Amino acid sequence: MLVDAGFNDLMRPAMYGSYHHISALAAEGRSLEHAPTVETVVAGPLCESGDVFTQQEGGNVETRALPEVKAGDYLVLHDTGAYGASMSSNYNSRPLLPEVLFDNGQARLIRRRQTIEELLALELL
């Protein structure tokens, strides 16, 4: 499954195979709780073979049992910690992603998405 995020947003799986639990959320509120699961490789849109979130140290790709999702649904990569933001970059001219903190079950936006204007503001030519 290809997702909007890439290793420029979360470098740790590509660097050293860090494991992050992945769960799915349906966009329009349908329940995925009892949906059948499919063995899934989760990868990003970058033009690099290492842009895979479900890999072990050394680059061995693994699958995760995830419910079938549709375009527009969300995947949550859990436990990314403080290093997600500090290790992220604008590689391939991609804006920085927003970050959400789950605090006692409540989602809180702690970093908004970078705009294209902000991304290009440092360019001189």
Where are each of the predicted segments found?
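Charged (often Lys/Glu-rich) extended helix/loop segments that serve as interaction or gating elements
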Residues: M1-L125
